[in-house]
Amino acid sequence: MENVFDYEDIQLIPAKCVVNSRSECDTSVTLGNRTFKLPVVPANMQTIIDEKIAKYLAEKNYFYIMHRFEPEKRIDFIQDMQEYNLFTSISVGVKEEEYTFIEDLAAKQLIPDYITIDIAHGHSDAVIKMIKHIKNNLPSSFVIAGNVGTPEAVRELENAGADATKVGIGPGKVCITKIKTGFGTGGWQLAALRWCAKAASKPIIADGGIRTHGDIAKSIRFGASMVMIGSLFAGHEESPGETIEQDGKKIKEYFGSASEFQKGEKKNVEGKKMYVEHKGPLQDTLTEMEQDLQSSISYAGGKQLDAIRNVDYVVVKNSIFNGDKVF
């Protein structure tokens, strides 16, 4: 591997602006048969998304992926969303009971629009087998498979039938895979994304390591169709999880998907818990992301998201922030 870099090492280079106002720039993106307002999806984690937020996002035309940590609620969730005439997007694992679950959905003719196979190490026989099982039983569902970190993995999952792959092994803020195992894309997630995107023939979802809104534009530049974000979506008014007051400040809990807090036991722990500052309404963050991305498109010299894919960039090793803080 040469040219290894991460988000903070990269600066995109502006091109001549062709709009009078950033509001002319269109941030929408198509995934499967649908077009969404932003190329961003909140992480399918228990402290980030719940049924209420999923419904809100779908109504407002944002992409969502419901988490898989209360498997018994999934059928009701699909039925509810369909009753509201909203798109359905769920997660599954690879255990035996998930095979039965997929067969149940087919038998009941409950067909999710999107199914994400969500395991920490997605380059595995188990995931390939599950992709094929879903495609046999629910051929019209759009299958996202992950998580992976290599071009070989992307090719194998695409060849097995995945409609998109999710790239990122342990770069997330509450993920400690890199520390516990020695493996992962933490510290070079953006380079891994670029490497994987070059091999991909289908969409890629970049997952993890996003710390600023500018990182969304950088992900698009290096090949992502959609960007999954955890920590920036944590701690909102609507977010699941407790709000507590500490030193006169409101904070909320945020924990990783393989943490003991999510599992309820201390076994194979690869996630941790942290508290994040209370961020106010979710819509404020979504609106700010859209405006920042519109600005990114205007700096890229275009009117559509794709303009960002063609800009030049420089590698500035770990120096672009010079201690800058947005707040």
Curated annotation (Swiss-Prot):
Enzyme Commission code: 1.7.1.7
Entry keyword Ribosomal protein: no
Q: Which GO terms describe its cellular component?
A: cytosol; GMP reductase complex
Q: Which residues form the active site?
A: 175
Residue sites binding NADP(+) per the record: 204-227
Which NCBIfam families does the record cross-reference, listed alphabetically? GMP_reduct_2 (TIGR01306), PRK05458.1 (NF003966)
Q: Which family does it belong to?
A: Belongs to the IMPDH/GMPR family. GuaC type 2 subfamily.
Concerning HAMAP family, the annotation shows:
GMP_reduct_type2
Q: What is this protein called?
A: GMP reductase
